[in-house]
Structures are given as C-alpha cells and as structure tokens.
C-alpha cells in the first residue's frame, strides 16, 4: 500500500508540473508582442538591401518609416540644392535657437554677416553625411532596434 501512495504522489507532482508548464507557456505567449516584427527578424545584425530592406521596414514599422528627403527639382527638372524653402530655413533657425538655449552660443557677428546661408550649408552638409536606413543596413549591418529607429510614430 505504501508503494501505491508514493505512485499517486509522483503522478500528482507530474500533473502539477505539466499544469505549471502549460500556464507558463500561455503567459509567455500573452506577453510576447505578436504585432511587432521582432519575431520575424532573427536576433543579431543583418545586411538588408533592396526588397529585403523594404520588406523588413514594412514589418518593423507598421505605420511607415522615415526616409531621407529627396532633392527638390526645379520646374526645368534640374536639382538645385541652393534653393531652400523659407519653411526649411525657419525649421533650422528654431533648431539653432534650441541649441542656443541649451548653452551653445553662436556669434551674433557671424549670424549678421551670413544670415541663413550658414544654416543652408549646414543642412546640405548634414544631408551628405547621413545615409539613412540604406547606409545603416545595406552598406553596414543593422539590428531590429536600429531598424525601429526609422519608424514613424503611431
């Protein structure tokens, strides 16, 4: 009779263990984000180019993603980087004001001498240096989190 009691206890422990394992599996399934592309992109860094990069961005960024601004083309079809819109100059001016308020002061003499021309040249230089998601993931390798940086907010 003693062996039957031990057998029932072992069977009960196995049943409890299976029940706990099933509950943990169900809890993990609820916690794991199913709407993100994180499961579809294996961990680690990847080199993604062309359609593979586009597909990965579509999966990772369901609300779209940022791209680099294209050069504006004039009515004749020629691109002209020197023609910046007034709104872009104002946007850059507000950026400089923010930096100025953060403790970075700029020379009023240079501002008076060059005006928005300095801002335009800085923006053009910044555009040239940053290659965006293509440079990040095709020229170099990138991870899921690096792709997610380019996602638009909801």
UniProtKB/Swiss-Prot annotation:
One Gene Ontology term, aspect cellular component:
extracellular space
Give one GO term, molecular function aspect: hormone activity
Extract one GO BP annotation from the record: insulin receptor signaling pathway
Q: Which coarse location class describes where this protein primarily resides?
A: secreted
Q: Which residues form the propeptide?
A: 73-122
In its keyword annotation, does this UniProt entry include Secreted? yes
What range does the record give for the signal peptide? Answer: 1-29
Q: Using the chain's own numbering, where are the disulfide bonds?
A: 49-138, 61-151, 137-142
Which UniProt keywords are present, listed alphabetically?
Cleavage on pair of basic residues, Disulfide bond, Secreted, Signal
The record's annotation in Pfam families points to:
Insulin
Which InterPro entries does the record match to this protein?
Answer: Insulin-like (IPR016179), Insulin-like_sf (IPR036438), Insulin_CS (IPR022353), Insulin_family (IPR022352)
Annotated spans, Disordered = 72-92
Bias class Acidic residues marks the residues at: 79-91
Against Gene3D superfamilies, the record matches this protein to: Insulin-like (1.10.100.10)
Where in the cell?
Answer: Secreted
Q: Which PANTHER family match?
A: INSULIN-LIKE PEPTIDE 1-RELATED (PTHR13647:SF4), INSULIN-LIKE PEPTIDE 2-RELATED (PTHR13647)
Q: What does this protein do?
A: Possible ligand of InR/insulin-like receptor.
- Spell out the family assignment given in the record's similarity comment: Belongs to the insulin family.
Oligomeric and partner information: Heterodimer of a B chain and an A chain linked by two disulfide bonds.
Quote the protein name from its UniProt record.
Insulin-like peptide 1
Taxonomic lineage: Eukaryota, Metazoa, Ecdysozoa, Arthropoda, Hexapoda
**Gene symbol of the encoding locus:** Ilp1
């Amino acid at each position: 009779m003693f062996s039957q009691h031990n057998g029932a206890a072992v069977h009960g422990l196995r049943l409890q263990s299976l029940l706990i394992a099933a509950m943990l599996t169900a809890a993990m399934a609820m916690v794991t984000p199913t709407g993100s592309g994180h499961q579809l992109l294996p961990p680690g860094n990847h080199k993604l180019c062309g359609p593979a990069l586009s597909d990965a961005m579509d999966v990772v960024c369901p609300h779209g993603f940022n791209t680099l601004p294209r050069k504006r083309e004039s009515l004749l079809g020629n691109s002209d980087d020197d023609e910046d819109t007034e709104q872009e100059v104002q946007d850059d001016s507000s950026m400089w004001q923010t930096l100025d308020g953060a403790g970075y002061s700029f020379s009023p003499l240079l501002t008076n001498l060059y005006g928005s021309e300095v801002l335009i040249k800085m923006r053009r230089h910044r555009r040239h240096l940053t290659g965006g998601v293509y440079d990040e993931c095709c020229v170099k390798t990138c991870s899921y989190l690096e792709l997610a940086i380019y996602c638009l907010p909801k």
